[in-house]
Amino acid sequence: MSEIELRNPSILEQITVIDFNPVVFRTLSDRGMHVVYGDISNVDTLLHAGVGKSELIILSIPNSLLKGADNEKLVRHVRSLNPTARIVATAELLSDVDDLYEAGADYVTVTRLSDAHHLFKVIEAAQAGLLEDKRAETDALLAERREVLP
Protein backbone atom coordinates (compact mmCIF):
# COMPACT_ATOMS: atom_id res chain seq x y z
CA MET A 1 0.00 0.00 0.00
CA SER A 2 2.89 2.33 0.73
CA GLU A 3 4.08 2.11 -2.87
CA ILE A 4 0.63 3.10 -4.12
CA GLU A 5 0.42 5.93 -1.57
CA LEU A 6 3.70 7.30 -2.90
CA ARG A 7 3.08 6.85 -6.62
CA ASN A 8 -0.66 7.37 -7.13
CA PRO A 9 -2.73 7.82 -3.95
CA SER A 10 -5.98 8.25 -5.90
CA ILE A 11 -5.89 4.52 -6.69
CA LEU A 12 -6.35 3.75 -2.98
CA GLU A 13 -10.03 4.72 -3.25
CA GLN A 14 -10.54 1.84 -5.70
CA ILE A 15 -8.86 -0.81 -3.56
CA THR A 16 -10.37 -3.29 -1.13
CA VAL A 17 -7.96 -5.27 1.03
CA ILE A 18 -8.87 -8.61 2.58
CA ASP A 19 -6.81 -9.51 5.64
CA PHE A 20 -7.26 -11.47 8.85
CA ASN A 21 -4.34 -9.83 10.68
CA PRO A 22 -5.91 -7.45 13.22
CA VAL A 23 -2.93 -5.07 13.07
CA VAL A 24 -3.14 -4.81 9.28
CA PHE A 25 -6.93 -4.40 9.46
CA ARG A 26 -6.72 -1.63 12.07
CA THR A 27 -3.82 0.20 10.39
CA LEU A 28 -5.46 0.25 6.97
CA SER A 29 -8.86 1.15 8.42
CA ASP A 30 -7.27 4.05 10.32
CA ARG A 31 -5.82 5.26 7.02
CA GLY A 32 -9.31 5.34 5.53
CA MET A 33 -8.92 2.29 3.32
CA HIS A 34 -11.70 -0.17 2.62
CA VAL A 35 -10.67 -3.34 4.45
CA VAL A 36 -12.58 -6.58 4.87
CA TYR A 37 -11.57 -8.66 7.86
CA GLY A 38 -11.48 -12.28 6.83
CA ASP A 39 -9.66 -15.23 5.38
CA ILE A 40 -9.04 -15.01 1.64
CA SER A 41 -9.39 -18.77 1.32
CA ASN A 42 -13.05 -18.48 2.41
CA VAL A 43 -15.43 -18.04 -0.53
CA ASP A 44 -17.92 -16.08 1.61
CA THR A 45 -15.18 -13.60 2.50
CA LEU A 46 -14.34 -13.17 -1.18
CA LEU A 47 -18.00 -12.57 -2.04
CA HIS A 48 -18.44 -10.11 0.84
CA ALA A 49 -15.37 -8.20 -0.36
CA GLY A 50 -16.86 -7.78 -3.83
CA VAL A 51 -14.51 -10.06 -5.75
CA GLY A 52 -17.37 -10.91 -8.10
CA LYS A 53 -17.44 -7.37 -9.49
CA SER A 54 -13.75 -6.45 -9.27
CA GLU A 55 -11.79 -5.57 -12.40
CA LEU A 56 -8.36 -6.42 -11.00
CA ILE A 57 -7.61 -8.89 -8.22
CA ILE A 58 -4.12 -9.15 -6.75
CA LEU A 59 -3.24 -12.22 -4.72
CA SER A 60 -0.04 -11.01 -3.07
CA ILE A 61 0.37 -13.50 -0.23
CA PRO A 62 2.92 -16.25 -0.94
CA ASN A 63 1.96 -19.88 -0.40
CA SER A 64 4.30 -20.14 2.58
CA LEU A 65 2.08 -17.71 4.51
CA LEU A 66 -1.28 -19.14 3.46
CA LYS A 67 -3.05 -21.57 5.78
CA GLY A 68 -5.33 -24.22 4.30
CA ALA A 69 -5.01 -22.90 0.75
CA ASP A 70 -2.49 -22.04 -1.91
CA ASN A 71 -2.43 -19.49 -4.69
CA GLU A 72 -3.48 -22.01 -7.33
CA LYS A 73 -6.62 -22.81 -5.35
CA LEU A 74 -7.27 -19.10 -4.73
CA VAL A 75 -6.90 -18.27 -8.42
CA ARG A 76 -9.40 -21.01 -9.28
CA HIS A 77 -11.88 -19.71 -6.66
CA VAL A 78 -11.52 -16.11 -7.77
CA ARG A 79 -11.78 -17.05 -11.45
CA SER A 80 -14.99 -19.00 -10.77
CA LEU A 81 -16.45 -16.00 -8.92
CA ASN A 82 -15.35 -13.51 -11.55
CA PRO A 83 -14.55 -14.87 -15.03
CA THR A 84 -13.70 -11.44 -16.46
CA ALA A 85 -11.41 -10.02 -13.76
CA ARG A 86 -7.71 -9.61 -14.34
CA ILE A 87 -5.94 -11.78 -11.76
CA VAL A 88 -2.36 -11.21 -10.62
CA ALA A 89 -0.95 -14.02 -8.50
CA THR A 90 2.26 -14.57 -6.57
CA ALA A 91 4.58 -17.55 -7.00
CA GLU A 92 7.50 -18.40 -4.76
CA LEU A 93 8.70 -21.22 -6.98
CA LEU A 94 9.25 -21.06 -10.72
CA SER A 95 7.57 -24.45 -10.95
CA ASP A 96 4.33 -22.85 -9.71
CA VAL A 97 4.13 -20.23 -12.47
CA ASP A 98 2.61 -22.45 -15.18
CA ASP A 99 0.14 -23.96 -12.68
CA LEU A 100 -1.07 -20.47 -11.75
CA TYR A 101 -1.54 -19.53 -15.40
CA GLU A 102 -3.44 -22.77 -16.01
CA ALA A 103 -5.61 -22.01 -12.97
CA GLY A 104 -6.63 -18.71 -14.56
CA ALA A 105 -4.08 -16.07 -13.55
CA ASP A 106 -3.46 -13.34 -16.11
CA TYR A 107 -0.06 -12.44 -14.65
CA VAL A 108 2.22 -14.16 -12.17
CA THR A 109 4.88 -12.33 -10.22
CA VAL A 110 7.84 -14.21 -8.79
CA THR A 111 9.04 -12.03 -5.94
CA ARG A 112 12.42 -13.67 -5.63
CA LEU A 113 13.20 -12.58 -9.21
CA SER A 114 12.59 -8.92 -8.35
CA ASP A 115 14.61 -9.45 -5.16
CA ALA A 116 17.45 -10.93 -7.23
CA HIS A 117 17.33 -7.93 -9.59
CA HIS A 118 17.64 -5.55 -6.63
CA LEU A 119 20.41 -7.62 -5.04
CA PHE A 120 22.39 -7.54 -8.29
CA LYS A 121 22.28 -3.73 -8.20
CA VAL A 122 23.64 -3.87 -4.64
CA ILE A 123 26.47 -6.16 -5.80
CA GLU A 124 27.28 -3.74 -8.63
CA ALA A 125 27.35 -0.84 -6.17
CA ALA A 126 29.66 -2.77 -3.84
CA GLN A 127 32.04 -3.63 -6.69
CA ALA A 128 32.12 0.03 -7.74
CA GLY A 129 32.89 1.13 -4.17
CA LEU A 130 29.46 2.76 -3.91
CA LEU A 131 27.82 0.57 -1.28
CA GLU A 132 27.49 3.48 1.15
CA ASP A 133 25.73 5.51 -1.56
CA LYS A 134 23.41 2.59 -2.29
CA ARG A 135 22.62 2.30 1.41
CA ALA A 136 21.89 6.04 1.64
CA GLU A 137 19.57 5.72 -1.37
CA THR A 138 17.73 2.81 0.26
CA ASP A 139 17.58 4.58 3.64
CA ALA A 140 15.98 7.60 1.94
CA LEU A 141 13.39 5.37 0.27
CA LEU A 142 12.61 3.62 3.54
CA ALA A 143 12.20 6.93 5.38
CA GLU A 144 9.39 8.06 3.08
CA ARG A 145 7.39 4.83 3.29
CA ARG A 146 4.43 4.14 5.55
CA GLU A 147 4.41 0.36 5.64
CA VAL A 148 1.44 -1.41 7.15
CA LEU A 149 3.66 -3.86 9.00
CA PRO A 150 6.86 -2.26 10.35
Which positions does each model-derived feature cover?
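Cytosolic regulatory regions of ion transport systems
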Residues: M1-P150
